[in-house]
Amino acid sequence: MHLKAHFRLSLIFIGLLFLSLPMTITAKDFTIDEMEFTFKNTQTFDDDALGSALGIYEDDLLDIDKVTQGIAGLKKFYFDNGFFEMSVDTSFSFNNEEETASLKFIISENRQYRIDSIIYNGLDKLSPELSRRIYRIKKIEKNKFYNRILIIDQTNEILDRLQNNGYMYARLKQDSGTVIRKFSGNTNSGVKVILNFEGADTLSYFGRTEIVIMDNVYNVDKELLRREIQYNEGDIYSKEKKLLSERNIAKLAIVQSAHIDPDSASIMKVDMTANVKLGPKYEILPYIRGTSIQNHFYFGGGAEYTDKYFLGGGRVLSANIDGLFNSSDLNRLEVSGTFTQPHFIFNKSTFSNKLTVGFYNLEGFKNYYAGNLSTVKYFISDKTFYNSLYLDLNEELVQFRYDDTSSILNIFHSMITLTAVHDNTNNVLSPSAGYYHSISAGSAGLIPKLVISALPNFNYSQFVKFYTGNRIYFNLNKIIPFSIFATSLKVGDIIEYGTGTQLVPVQPIYKFFSGGSGSLRGWNAKENGILANKELGGNFLLEGSIELRKKLFPSKENFMKNINGALFIDYGNVWETSKQFRIDQIALATGFGFRYDLFFGAVRIDFGFKLYDPNDTNAKWLFSDPSKIFKSKFAIQFGIGEAF
Protein backbone atom coordinates (compact mmCIF):
# COMPACT_ATOMS: atom_id res chain seq x y z
CA MET A 1 0.00 0.00 0.00
CA HIS A 2 1.23 3.50 -0.82
CA LEU A 3 2.90 5.40 2.06
CA LYS A 4 0.44 8.31 1.78
CA ALA A 5 -2.48 5.90 2.03
CA HIS A 6 -0.95 4.38 5.17
CA PHE A 7 -0.57 7.88 6.62
CA ARG A 8 -4.18 8.79 5.82
CA LEU A 9 -5.46 5.58 7.44
CA SER A 10 -3.36 6.28 10.54
CA LEU A 11 -4.81 9.77 10.84
CA ILE A 12 -8.35 8.44 10.47
CA PHE A 13 -7.70 5.78 13.15
CA ILE A 14 -6.23 8.33 15.59
CA GLY A 15 -9.13 10.70 14.92
CA LEU A 16 -11.71 7.99 15.57
CA LEU A 17 -9.88 7.00 18.77
CA PHE A 18 -9.88 10.61 19.99
CA LEU A 19 -13.55 11.11 19.15
CA SER A 20 -14.45 7.93 20.98
CA LEU A 21 -12.81 9.11 24.24
CA PRO A 22 -15.86 11.07 25.48
CA MET A 23 -18.07 8.10 24.53
CA THR A 24 -15.78 5.78 26.50
CA ILE A 25 -15.86 8.07 29.51
CA THR A 26 -19.60 8.54 29.43
CA ALA A 27 -20.28 4.86 28.89
CA LYS A 28 -19.60 4.48 32.60
CA ASP A 29 -20.34 6.82 35.44
CA PHE A 30 -16.88 7.65 36.76
CA THR A 31 -16.62 9.33 40.15
CA ILE A 32 -13.87 11.87 40.71
CA ASP A 33 -11.83 10.46 43.58
CA GLU A 34 -8.82 12.79 43.31
CA MET A 35 -8.25 16.26 41.95
CA GLU A 36 -4.76 17.76 41.90
CA PHE A 37 -3.42 21.20 41.02
CA THR A 38 0.25 21.49 40.08
CA PHE A 39 2.13 24.63 39.10
CA LYS A 40 4.95 25.21 36.64
CA ASN A 41 6.14 28.41 38.28
CA THR A 42 4.26 30.20 41.07
CA GLN A 43 1.15 29.39 43.11
CA THR A 44 -0.94 32.38 44.24
CA PHE A 45 -4.24 30.77 45.25
CA ASP A 46 -4.91 27.75 47.45
CA ASP A 47 -6.64 24.61 46.23
CA ASP A 48 -9.97 25.52 47.86
CA ALA A 49 -10.16 28.81 45.93
CA LEU A 50 -9.23 27.09 42.67
CA GLY A 51 -11.74 24.30 43.25
CA SER A 52 -14.44 26.88 43.87
CA ALA A 53 -13.55 28.68 40.62
CA LEU A 54 -13.49 25.37 38.77
CA GLY A 55 -16.87 24.32 40.18
CA ILE A 56 -15.82 20.67 40.28
CA TYR A 57 -15.23 18.71 43.47
CA GLU A 58 -14.10 15.28 44.57
CA ASP A 59 -16.95 12.74 44.72
CA ASP A 60 -18.71 14.50 41.81
CA LEU A 61 -19.58 12.40 38.76
CA LEU A 62 -17.17 13.10 35.91
CA ASP A 63 -18.79 15.20 33.20
CA ILE A 64 -16.53 16.26 30.30
CA ASP A 65 -18.74 19.24 29.42
CA LYS A 66 -18.62 20.37 33.03
CA VAL A 67 -14.82 20.00 33.07
CA THR A 68 -14.59 22.12 29.93
CA GLN A 69 -16.81 24.79 31.49
CA GLY A 70 -14.80 24.54 34.71
CA ILE A 71 -11.51 25.19 32.91
CA ALA A 72 -13.07 28.25 31.28
CA GLY A 73 -14.19 29.40 34.74
CA LEU A 74 -10.69 28.80 36.12
CA LYS A 75 -9.13 30.89 33.34
CA LYS A 76 -11.65 33.66 33.97
CA PHE A 77 -10.84 33.57 37.69
CA TYR A 78 -7.16 34.06 36.93
CA PHE A 79 -7.88 36.71 34.30
CA ASP A 80 -10.04 38.67 36.77
CA ASN A 81 -7.07 38.70 39.15
CA GLY A 82 -4.57 40.06 36.63
CA PHE A 83 -3.10 36.83 35.21
CA PHE A 84 -3.76 37.63 31.55
CA GLU A 85 -1.28 35.07 30.21
CA MET A 86 -2.21 32.11 32.40
CA SER A 87 -2.51 28.69 30.78
CA VAL A 88 -3.76 25.33 32.03
CA ASP A 89 -3.23 21.76 30.81
CA THR A 90 -5.41 18.86 31.92
CA SER A 91 -4.78 15.15 32.28
CA PHE A 92 -7.13 12.30 33.22
CA SER A 93 -6.47 8.85 34.64
CA PHE A 94 -9.15 6.19 35.03
CA ASN A 95 -9.65 3.14 37.23
CA ASN A 96 -12.15 0.98 35.36
CA GLU A 97 -12.52 -1.53 38.18
CA GLU A 98 -13.45 1.05 40.80
CA GLU A 99 -15.04 3.37 38.20
CA THR A 100 -13.10 6.37 39.47
CA ALA A 101 -11.22 9.14 37.73
CA SER A 102 -8.32 11.34 38.77
CA LEU A 103 -7.98 14.86 37.36
CA LYS A 104 -4.76 16.82 37.20
CA PHE A 105 -4.61 20.50 36.30
CA ILE A 106 -1.16 21.83 35.38
CA ILE A 107 -1.21 25.61 35.75
CA SER A 108 1.24 28.18 34.41
CA GLU A 109 0.29 31.42 36.15
CA ASN A 110 2.92 33.57 34.43
CA ARG A 111 2.92 37.30 35.15
CA GLN A 112 0.37 39.02 37.40
CA TYR A 113 -0.23 42.53 36.13
CA ARG A 114 -0.37 45.60 38.34
CA ILE A 115 -2.35 48.79 37.79
CA ASP A 116 -0.08 51.42 36.26
CA SER A 117 -2.60 54.27 36.21
CA ILE A 118 -6.28 55.08 36.81
CA ILE A 119 -7.98 57.65 34.60
CA TYR A 120 -11.46 59.12 35.10
CA ASN A 121 -13.12 60.85 32.15
CA GLY A 122 -16.32 62.89 32.32
CA LEU A 123 -15.93 64.16 35.90
CA ASP A 124 -14.29 67.52 35.13
CA LYS A 125 -17.41 69.60 35.98
CA LEU A 126 -17.79 68.36 39.56
CA SER A 127 -17.36 70.68 42.51
CA PRO A 128 -13.90 70.56 44.15
CA GLU A 129 -15.38 69.01 47.30
CA LEU A 130 -17.20 66.21 45.44
CA SER A 131 -14.10 65.58 43.32
CA ARG A 132 -12.00 65.17 46.46
CA ARG A 133 -14.54 62.74 47.91
CA ILE A 134 -14.52 60.66 44.73
CA TYR A 135 -10.73 60.57 44.45
CA ARG A 136 -10.56 59.40 48.07
CA ILE A 137 -12.30 56.15 47.05
CA LYS A 138 -9.48 53.61 47.09
CA LYS A 139 -10.95 50.23 46.14
CA ILE A 140 -8.26 50.13 43.44
CA GLU A 141 -4.90 51.89 43.61
CA LYS A 142 -1.85 52.43 41.44
CA ASN A 143 0.78 49.68 41.76
CA LYS A 144 -1.74 47.25 43.27
CA PHE A 145 -2.58 44.06 41.39
CA TYR A 146 -5.38 44.23 38.83
CA ASN A 147 -8.67 42.89 40.20
CA ARG A 148 -11.87 43.03 38.17
CA ILE A 149 -14.20 42.81 41.19
CA LEU A 150 -12.47 45.74 42.89
CA ILE A 151 -12.77 47.79 39.69
CA ILE A 152 -16.52 47.10 39.66
CA ASP A 153 -16.71 48.06 43.36
CA GLN A 154 -14.80 51.28 42.64
CA THR A 155 -17.11 52.13 39.74
CA ASN A 156 -20.29 51.44 41.73
CA GLU A 157 -19.12 53.52 44.68
CA ILE A 158 -18.30 56.46 42.39
CA LEU A 159 -21.72 56.19 40.73
CA ASP A 160 -23.45 56.02 44.12
CA ARG A 161 -21.60 59.12 45.24
CA LEU A 162 -22.54 60.97 42.05
CA GLN A 163 -26.19 59.90 42.16
CA ASN A 164 -26.46 60.84 45.83
CA ASN A 165 -25.15 64.33 45.10
CA GLY A 166 -27.46 65.48 42.34
CA TYR A 167 -26.19 63.67 39.25
CA MET A 168 -29.26 61.52 38.72
CA TYR A 169 -28.27 60.43 35.20
CA ALA A 170 -24.63 59.63 35.94
CA ARG A 171 -23.52 56.31 34.48
CA LEU A 172 -20.70 54.61 32.60
CA LYS A 173 -20.72 55.11 28.84
CA GLN A 174 -22.54 52.22 27.26
CA ASP A 175 -20.03 51.55 24.47
CA SER A 176 -16.78 52.28 26.32
CA GLY A 177 -17.48 52.59 30.03
CA THR A 178 -14.54 50.60 31.33
CA VAL A 179 -11.39 50.34 29.22
CA ILE A 180 -8.46 48.16 30.28
CA ARG A 181 -5.23 48.64 28.34
CA LYS A 182 -2.46 46.13 28.91
CA PHE A 183 1.13 46.84 28.02
CA SER A 184 4.22 44.71 28.57
CA GLY A 185 7.89 44.99 27.86
CA ASN A 186 11.24 43.84 29.04
CA THR A 187 11.49 46.53 31.71
CA ASN A 188 7.92 47.57 32.40
CA SER A 189 4.43 46.09 32.21
CA GLY A 190 1.01 46.90 33.64
CA VAL A 191 -2.54 47.94 32.89
CA LYS A 192 -4.23 51.29 32.52
CA VAL A 193 -7.74 51.45 33.97
CA ILE A 194 -9.89 54.05 32.20
CA LEU A 195 -13.41 54.76 33.48
CA ASN A 196 -15.52 56.86 31.11
CA PHE A 197 -18.52 58.50 32.79
CA GLU A 198 -21.39 60.49 31.32
CA GLY A 199 -24.27 62.43 32.85
CA ALA A 200 -22.03 64.02 35.49
CA ASP A 201 -22.25 67.52 34.04
CA THR A 202 -25.73 68.73 35.12
CA LEU A 203 -27.30 68.71 38.58
CA SER A 204 -30.85 67.43 39.03
CA TYR A 205 -33.33 68.48 41.72
CA PHE A 206 -36.40 66.80 43.16
CA GLY A 207 -39.62 68.22 41.76
CA ARG A 208 -43.14 67.43 42.91
CA THR A 209 -43.94 63.91 44.10
CA GLU A 210 -47.37 62.53 43.26
CA ILE A 211 -48.57 59.61 45.35
CA VAL A 212 -50.66 57.03 43.50
CA ILE A 213 -52.35 54.35 45.62
CA MET A 214 -53.57 51.46 43.51
CA ASP A 215 -57.01 50.08 44.51
CA ASN A 216 -57.28 52.24 47.63
CA VAL A 217 -60.28 50.34 49.02
CA TYR A 218 -59.32 51.18 52.63
CA ASN A 219 -59.12 54.96 52.04
CA VAL A 220 -55.49 55.12 53.14
CA ASP A 221 -54.48 58.74 53.67
CA LYS A 222 -51.86 59.91 51.16
CA GLU A 223 -50.44 62.31 53.74
CA LEU A 224 -49.57 59.33 55.92
CA LEU A 225 -47.39 58.04 53.08
CA ARG A 226 -46.00 61.50 52.32
CA ARG A 227 -44.61 61.74 55.85
CA GLU A 228 -42.30 58.84 55.00
CA ILE A 229 -40.68 60.70 52.08
CA GLN A 230 -37.19 61.79 53.09
CA TYR A 231 -36.73 64.68 50.63
CA ASN A 232 -38.48 67.95 49.83
CA GLU A 233 -39.29 69.60 46.53
CA GLY A 234 -36.25 71.58 45.43
CA ASP A 235 -33.68 69.39 47.20
CA ILE A 236 -30.68 68.16 45.23
CA TYR A 237 -31.46 64.69 43.89
CA SER A 238 -30.23 61.79 46.01
CA LYS A 239 -30.73 58.15 45.07
CA GLU A 240 -30.14 57.22 48.71
CA LYS A 241 -33.02 59.45 49.89
CA LYS A 242 -35.29 58.08 47.17
CA LEU A 243 -34.58 54.47 48.16
CA LEU A 244 -34.95 55.29 51.87
CA SER A 245 -38.34 56.86 51.12
CA GLU A 246 -39.43 53.69 49.30
CA ARG A 247 -38.33 51.53 52.22
CA ASN A 248 -40.07 53.75 54.77
CA ILE A 249 -43.37 53.68 52.88
CA ALA A 250 -43.11 49.89 52.45
CA LYS A 251 -42.57 49.47 56.21
CA LEU A 252 -46.13 50.61 56.89
CA ALA A 253 -48.10 47.46 57.66
CA ILE A 254 -50.87 48.18 55.16
CA VAL A 255 -48.40 48.69 52.27
CA GLN A 256 -47.33 45.73 50.17
CA SER A 257 -44.86 47.55 47.90
CA ALA A 258 -43.74 51.06 47.00
CA HIS A 259 -41.70 52.39 44.07
CA ILE A 260 -40.73 55.99 43.37
CA ASP A 261 -39.98 56.65 39.70
CA PRO A 262 -39.17 59.80 37.68
CA ASP A 263 -42.26 61.21 36.00
CA SER A 264 -40.74 63.82 33.73
CA ALA A 265 -38.00 64.02 31.12
CA SER A 266 -36.53 67.19 32.61
CA ILE A 267 -32.90 66.96 33.68
CA MET A 268 -32.86 69.97 36.00
CA LYS A 269 -36.06 69.43 38.02
CA VAL A 270 -37.46 65.91 38.08
CA ASP A 271 -41.03 65.20 39.16
CA MET A 272 -41.60 61.84 40.83
CA THR A 273 -44.46 59.38 41.15
CA ALA A 274 -44.73 57.10 44.18
CA ASN A 275 -46.67 54.02 43.09
CA VAL A 276 -48.00 52.26 46.19
CA LYS A 277 -49.70 48.88 46.32
CA LEU A 278 -51.68 47.94 49.42
CA GLY A 279 -51.86 44.55 51.05
CA PRO A 280 -54.85 43.00 52.83
CA LYS A 281 -56.09 44.97 55.86
CA TYR A 282 -56.94 41.92 57.97
CA GLU A 283 -54.81 38.85 58.42
CA ILE A 284 -54.93 35.68 60.51
CA LEU A 285 -51.72 33.66 60.52
CA PRO A 286 -50.89 30.45 62.37
CA TYR A 287 -47.21 30.01 63.17
CA ILE A 288 -44.68 27.73 64.80
CA ARG A 289 -41.58 28.98 66.56
CA GLY A 290 -38.66 28.03 68.75
CA THR A 291 -37.06 30.37 71.24
CA SER A 292 -34.79 30.47 74.26
CA ILE A 293 -36.29 31.84 77.51
CA GLN A 294 -34.13 31.97 80.63
CA ASN A 295 -31.66 29.68 78.80
CA HIS A 296 -34.26 26.92 78.21
CA PHE A 297 -35.21 26.12 74.62
CA TYR A 298 -38.97 26.11 74.00
CA PHE A 299 -40.83 24.99 70.90
CA GLY A 300 -44.43 25.75 70.09
CA GLY A 301 -46.66 28.03 68.11
CA GLY A 302 -49.88 29.94 67.99
CA ALA A 303 -51.99 32.25 65.88
CA GLU A 304 -51.97 35.99 65.25
CA TYR A 305 -54.79 38.27 64.11
CA THR A 306 -53.74 41.64 62.65
CA ASP A 307 -55.64 44.75 61.61
CA LYS A 308 -53.03 46.63 59.56
CA TYR A 309 -54.93 49.95 59.36
CA PHE A 310 -56.69 50.15 62.71
CA LEU A 311 -58.65 53.42 62.99
CA GLY A 312 -56.52 54.92 60.20
CA GLY A 313 -53.26 56.80 60.63
CA GLY A 314 -51.10 53.73 60.02
CA ARG A 315 -52.06 52.21 63.37
CA VAL A 316 -51.82 48.44 63.77
CA LEU A 317 -53.74 46.20 66.17
CA SER A 318 -52.72 42.59 66.69
CA ALA A 319 -53.87 39.79 68.99
CA ASN A 320 -51.90 36.61 69.73
CA ILE A 321 -52.36 33.31 71.45
CA ASP A 322 -49.04 31.58 72.00
CA GLY A 323 -48.10 28.23 73.55
CA LEU A 324 -44.54 27.04 74.20
CA PHE A 325 -43.33 23.68 75.47
CA ASN A 326 -40.03 22.46 76.90
CA SER A 327 -41.20 19.61 79.14
CA SER A 328 -44.12 18.69 81.37
CA ASP A 329 -42.55 20.88 84.06
CA LEU A 330 -41.63 23.78 81.75
CA ASN A 331 -44.34 25.23 79.53
CA ARG A 332 -46.07 28.54 78.87
CA LEU A 333 -49.38 29.87 77.58
CA GLU A 334 -49.91 33.55 76.73
CA VAL A 335 -52.66 35.72 75.28
CA SER A 336 -51.64 39.22 74.23
CA GLY A 337 -52.79 42.26 72.32
CA THR A 338 -50.54 44.96 70.83
CA PHE A 339 -51.34 48.45 69.56
CA THR A 340 -48.75 50.27 67.41
CA GLN A 341 -48.77 53.96 66.46
CA PRO A 342 -46.25 55.24 63.87
CA HIS A 343 -45.12 58.89 63.86
CA PHE A 344 -45.54 59.20 67.62
CA ILE A 345 -44.66 62.83 68.40
CA PHE A 346 -41.88 62.72 65.78
CA ASN A 347 -41.73 61.22 62.29
CA LYS A 348 -38.91 58.90 63.36
CA SER A 349 -40.58 57.58 66.49
CA THR A 350 -43.03 54.71 67.01
CA PHE A 351 -45.15 53.91 70.06
CA SER A 352 -46.42 50.45 70.94
CA ASN A 353 -48.38 49.09 73.88
CA LYS A 354 -48.67 45.37 74.65
CA LEU A 355 -51.06 43.80 77.17
CA THR A 356 -50.35 40.20 78.17
CA VAL A 357 -51.89 37.60 80.44
CA GLY A 358 -50.10 34.33 80.89
CA PHE A 359 -49.72 31.09 82.78
CA TYR A 360 -46.21 29.66 83.16
CA ASN A 361 -45.04 26.33 84.59
CA LEU A 362 -41.47 26.87 85.82
CA GLU A 363 -38.95 25.00 87.96
CA GLY A 364 -40.50 24.66 91.39
CA PHE A 365 -43.35 27.11 90.97
CA LYS A 366 -46.12 28.42 88.74
CA ASN A 367 -46.59 32.00 87.56
CA TYR A 368 -49.90 33.73 86.94
CA TYR A 369 -49.02 36.86 85.03
CA ALA A 370 -50.66 40.10 83.85
CA GLY A 371 -48.46 42.76 82.33
CA ASN A 372 -48.31 45.89 80.23
CA LEU A 373 -45.28 46.94 78.18
CA SER A 374 -45.16 50.42 76.64
CA THR A 375 -42.32 51.12 74.20
CA VAL A 376 -41.21 54.25 72.37
CA LYS A 377 -38.68 53.59 69.60
CA TYR A 378 -36.76 56.47 68.06
CA PHE A 379 -34.73 55.90 64.91
CA ILE A 380 -31.68 58.17 64.88
CA SER A 381 -29.80 57.45 61.63
CA ASP A 382 -27.91 54.76 59.75
CA LYS A 383 -24.89 57.07 59.69
CA THR A 384 -24.48 57.49 63.46
CA PHE A 385 -22.96 54.85 65.73
CA TYR A 386 -26.16 54.38 67.71
CA ASN A 387 -28.93 53.86 65.18
CA SER A 388 -31.95 53.55 67.50
CA LEU A 389 -33.11 54.36 71.03
CA TYR A 390 -35.77 52.43 72.97
CA LEU A 391 -37.62 53.57 76.08
CA ASP A 392 -39.57 50.79 77.82
CA LEU A 393 -42.00 51.05 80.72
CA ASN A 394 -43.00 47.65 82.06
CA GLU A 395 -45.66 46.99 84.74
CA GLU A 396 -46.39 43.44 85.90
CA LEU A 397 -48.58 41.71 88.45
CA VAL A 398 -47.12 38.25 89.08
CA GLN A 399 -48.31 35.54 91.44
CA PHE A 400 -45.85 32.80 92.46
CA ARG A 401 -47.39 29.48 93.59
CA TYR A 402 -44.66 27.16 94.90
CA ASP A 403 -44.83 23.41 94.30
CA ASP A 404 -43.33 22.32 97.62
CA THR A 405 -45.31 24.64 99.91
CA SER A 406 -48.74 26.20 100.08
CA SER A 407 -47.26 29.71 100.25
CA ILE A 408 -48.09 32.34 97.64
CA LEU A 409 -46.03 35.42 96.74
CA ASN A 410 -47.63 38.35 94.91
CA ILE A 411 -45.24 40.74 93.14
CA PHE A 412 -45.88 44.16 91.66
CA HIS A 413 -42.97 44.76 89.30
CA SER A 414 -42.39 47.96 87.38
CA MET A 415 -39.28 48.87 85.41
CA ILE A 416 -38.23 51.72 83.15
CA THR A 417 -35.36 50.96 80.75
CA LEU A 418 -33.42 52.98 78.17
CA THR A 419 -31.62 51.04 75.43
CA ALA A 420 -29.30 52.24 72.66
CA VAL A 421 -28.64 49.97 69.66
CA HIS A 422 -26.04 49.91 66.91
CA ASP A 423 -26.62 47.35 64.16
CA ASN A 424 -24.87 47.17 60.81
CA THR A 425 -25.06 43.39 60.38
CA ASN A 426 -25.95 42.29 56.86
CA ASN A 427 -28.60 39.68 57.61
CA VAL A 428 -31.22 39.29 60.33
CA LEU A 429 -31.28 35.48 60.38
CA SER A 430 -27.68 34.56 59.55
CA PRO A 431 -25.22 37.48 59.48
CA SER A 432 -21.88 37.06 57.73
CA ALA A 433 -20.50 40.55 58.38
CA GLY A 434 -21.09 43.50 60.67
CA TYR A 435 -21.31 44.50 64.30
CA TYR A 436 -24.27 44.50 66.68
CA HIS A 437 -24.07 46.34 70.01
CA SER A 438 -26.72 47.24 72.57
CA ILE A 439 -26.42 48.85 75.96
CA SER A 440 -29.27 49.35 78.42
CA ALA A 441 -29.86 50.76 81.87
CA GLY A 442 -33.05 50.21 83.84
CA SER A 443 -34.53 50.97 87.23
CA ALA A 444 -37.15 48.80 88.95
CA GLY A 445 -39.36 49.58 91.92
CA LEU A 446 -39.95 53.33 91.64
CA ILE A 447 -43.68 53.15 90.83
CA PRO A 448 -44.43 50.25 93.26
CA LYS A 449 -42.79 52.17 96.10
CA LEU A 450 -45.21 55.06 95.52
CA VAL A 451 -48.39 52.95 95.43
CA ILE A 452 -47.52 49.86 97.47
CA SER A 453 -49.38 51.13 100.52
CA ALA A 454 -52.60 50.70 98.51
CA LEU A 455 -51.65 47.08 97.70
CA PRO A 456 -51.06 45.42 101.09
CA ASN A 457 -51.02 41.90 99.60
CA PHE A 458 -48.23 42.67 97.12
CA ASN A 459 -44.45 42.84 97.43
CA TYR A 460 -41.90 44.52 95.19
CA SER A 461 -38.16 44.72 94.53
CA GLN A 462 -35.92 47.73 93.98
CA PHE A 463 -32.85 47.43 91.78
CA VAL A 464 -30.99 48.92 88.85
CA LYS A 465 -29.99 46.71 85.95
CA PHE A 466 -27.23 47.26 83.39
CA TYR A 467 -26.69 45.09 80.34
CA THR A 468 -24.68 45.12 77.13
CA GLY A 469 -24.82 42.62 74.27
CA ASN A 470 -22.22 42.55 71.48
CA ARG A 471 -21.82 40.40 68.36
CA ILE A 472 -19.23 40.72 65.58
CA TYR A 473 -19.20 38.77 62.30
CA PHE A 474 -16.35 38.41 59.78
CA ASN A 475 -16.61 36.89 56.31
CA LEU A 476 -13.57 34.61 55.85
CA ASN A 477 -14.21 33.75 52.20
CA LYS A 478 -10.78 34.94 51.09
CA ILE A 479 -9.04 32.78 53.72
CA ILE A 480 -11.40 29.83 54.21
CA PRO A 481 -14.07 29.62 51.46
CA PHE A 482 -17.70 29.72 52.60
CA SER A 483 -16.72 30.46 56.20
CA ILE A 484 -17.73 33.00 58.85
CA PHE A 485 -16.01 33.89 62.11
CA ALA A 486 -18.38 35.14 64.82
CA THR A 487 -17.83 36.32 68.36
CA SER A 488 -20.11 37.58 71.12
CA LEU A 489 -19.83 39.17 74.56
CA LYS A 490 -22.59 39.74 77.15
CA VAL A 491 -22.21 41.55 80.47
CA GLY A 492 -25.04 42.21 82.92
CA ASP A 493 -25.22 43.54 86.46
CA ILE A 494 -28.14 43.88 88.91
CA ILE A 495 -27.66 46.11 91.95
CA GLU A 496 -30.33 45.83 94.65
CA TYR A 497 -31.18 48.68 97.02
CA GLY A 498 -33.94 50.00 99.27
CA THR A 499 -35.67 48.99 102.49
CA GLY A 500 -39.27 48.37 103.47
CA THR A 501 -41.62 45.82 104.95
CA GLN A 502 -42.95 44.81 101.52
CA LEU A 503 -39.54 44.79 99.82
CA VAL A 504 -38.27 41.36 98.69
CA PRO A 505 -35.08 40.24 96.86
CA VAL A 506 -35.02 40.21 93.07
CA GLN A 507 -37.05 37.24 91.87
CA PRO A 508 -35.46 34.54 89.64
CA ILE A 509 -37.44 35.52 86.53
CA TYR A 510 -35.53 38.84 86.43
CA LYS A 511 -32.03 37.42 87.07
CA PHE A 512 -29.20 36.05 84.89
CA PHE A 513 -28.47 32.38 84.18
CA SER A 514 -25.64 30.40 82.60
CA GLY A 515 -25.62 27.19 80.59
CA GLY A 516 -27.84 26.17 77.70
CA SER A 517 -28.30 26.42 73.95
CA GLY A 518 -27.52 30.15 73.72
CA SER A 519 -25.04 30.21 76.59
CA LEU A 520 -22.20 27.88 77.63
CA ARG A 521 -23.08 24.83 75.59
CA GLY A 522 -21.14 22.33 77.69
CA TRP A 523 -23.78 22.77 80.42
CA ASN A 524 -27.50 22.21 80.21
CA ALA A 525 -29.80 25.16 80.89
CA LYS A 526 -29.18 26.87 84.25
CA GLU A 527 -26.60 24.27 85.34
CA ASN A 528 -23.58 26.60 85.38
CA GLY A 529 -22.87 29.28 87.95
CA ILE A 530 -20.90 30.22 91.06
CA LEU A 531 -24.15 30.09 93.00
CA ALA A 532 -25.64 28.24 95.95
CA ASN A 533 -28.70 27.44 93.80
CA LYS A 534 -28.04 27.76 90.06
CA GLU A 535 -31.74 27.55 89.14
CA LEU A 536 -32.41 30.79 91.07
CA GLY A 537 -29.89 32.73 88.97
CA GLY A 538 -27.41 35.44 89.87
CA ASN A 539 -27.02 39.21 89.70
CA PHE A 540 -23.80 39.42 87.67
CA LEU A 541 -23.17 37.82 84.27
CA LEU A 542 -20.12 37.75 82.02
CA GLU A 543 -20.37 35.46 79.02
CA GLY A 544 -19.09 35.18 75.47
CA SER A 545 -18.38 32.90 72.53
CA ILE A 546 -16.18 32.54 69.49
CA GLU A 547 -17.41 30.39 66.61
CA LEU A 548 -16.23 29.31 63.18
CA ARG A 549 -19.12 28.56 60.80
CA LYS A 550 -18.68 26.89 57.41
CA LYS A 551 -20.85 25.56 54.61
CA LEU A 552 -19.98 21.87 54.36
CA PHE A 553 -21.24 21.09 50.84
CA PRO A 554 -21.31 24.39 48.90
CA SER A 555 -21.18 22.71 45.48
CA LYS A 556 -24.15 20.40 46.03
CA GLU A 557 -27.44 21.20 44.34
CA ASN A 558 -29.61 18.99 46.56
CA PHE A 559 -30.64 19.25 50.21
CA MET A 560 -26.99 18.92 51.29
CA LYS A 561 -26.17 22.47 50.20
CA ASN A 562 -28.03 23.78 53.27
CA ILE A 563 -25.90 21.85 55.78
CA ASN A 564 -23.43 23.96 57.77
CA GLY A 565 -20.94 23.06 60.47
CA ALA A 566 -19.56 25.01 63.43
CA LEU A 567 -16.69 24.84 65.91
CA PHE A 568 -17.05 26.91 69.07
CA ILE A 569 -15.57 27.97 72.39
CA ASP A 570 -17.87 29.50 75.02
CA TYR A 571 -16.68 31.24 78.17
CA GLY A 572 -18.19 32.95 81.19
CA ASN A 573 -20.20 32.46 84.35
CA VAL A 574 -22.80 33.99 86.62
CA TRP A 575 -22.14 35.18 90.19
CA GLU A 576 -24.31 36.34 93.12
CA THR A 577 -22.90 39.88 92.76
CA SER A 578 -20.18 41.62 90.77
CA LYS A 579 -18.05 41.85 93.93
CA GLN A 580 -17.68 38.05 93.91
CA PHE A 581 -16.33 37.91 90.34
CA ARG A 582 -13.02 36.04 89.93
CA ILE A 583 -11.14 35.40 86.69
CA ASP A 584 -10.25 31.83 87.66
CA GLN A 585 -13.99 31.08 87.96
CA ILE A 586 -14.65 31.77 84.29
CA ALA A 587 -15.89 28.47 82.86
CA LEU A 588 -14.97 27.23 79.37
CA ALA A 589 -16.94 25.05 76.97
CA THR A 590 -15.96 23.77 73.55
CA GLY A 591 -17.57 21.64 70.90
CA PHE A 592 -19.00 21.37 67.42
CA GLY A 593 -22.38 21.46 65.80
CA PHE A 594 -24.45 21.27 62.65
CA ARG A 595 -27.06 23.61 61.19
CA TYR A 596 -29.62 23.15 58.44
CA ASP A 597 -30.81 26.35 56.76
CA LEU A 598 -34.56 26.77 56.33
CA PHE A 599 -36.59 29.82 55.31
CA PHE A 600 -37.20 30.82 58.95
CA GLY A 601 -33.58 30.31 60.04
CA ALA A 602 -31.20 27.51 60.89
CA VAL A 603 -32.24 24.38 62.79
CA ARG A 604 -29.29 23.79 65.09
CA ILE A 605 -27.76 20.93 67.08
CA ASP A 606 -24.58 21.44 69.13
CA PHE A 607 -22.42 18.96 71.02
CA GLY A 608 -20.77 20.78 73.91
CA PHE A 609 -18.05 19.75 76.36
CA LYS A 610 -17.01 21.32 79.67
CA LEU A 611 -13.47 22.32 78.80
CA TYR A 612 -12.91 23.99 82.19
CA ASP A 613 -15.36 23.68 85.10
CA PRO A 614 -14.40 25.81 88.12
CA ASN A 615 -17.05 24.03 90.23
CA ASP A 616 -15.53 20.58 89.73
CA THR A 617 -12.94 20.28 92.51
CA ASN A 618 -11.65 16.88 91.34
CA ALA A 619 -11.48 17.31 87.55
CA LYS A 620 -11.66 20.93 86.47
CA TRP A 621 -10.31 20.29 82.95
CA LEU A 622 -12.02 18.13 80.35
CA PHE A 623 -9.25 15.52 80.15
CA SER A 624 -8.38 15.47 83.86
CA ASP A 625 -10.63 12.41 84.17
CA PRO A 626 -11.48 10.91 80.72
CA SER A 627 -14.10 8.63 82.27
CA LYS A 628 -16.25 11.70 83.02
CA ILE A 629 -16.23 13.16 79.51
CA PHE A 630 -19.49 11.58 78.32
CA LYS A 631 -21.00 11.21 81.79
CA SER A 632 -20.89 14.65 83.39
CA LYS A 633 -18.96 16.87 80.98
CA PHE A 634 -21.09 16.63 77.86
CA ALA A 635 -24.37 18.19 76.71
CA ILE A 636 -26.46 18.16 73.53
CA GLN A 637 -28.15 21.46 72.66
CA PHE A 638 -30.97 22.19 70.22
CA GLY A 639 -32.02 25.55 68.85
CA ILE A 640 -33.61 27.48 66.01
CA GLY A 641 -31.37 30.18 64.61
CA GLU A 642 -27.69 30.62 65.32
CA ALA A 643 -26.49 30.60 68.93
CA PHE A 644 -25.80 34.34 68.51
Task: Name each model feature, range by range.
Residues 249, 305, 339, 470, ...:
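Hydrophobic, well-ordered secondary-structure elements that form the walls
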Residues 27-292, 303-304, 316-336, 469, ...:
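Periplasmic polypeptide-binding modules associated with outer-membrane biogenesis and secretion
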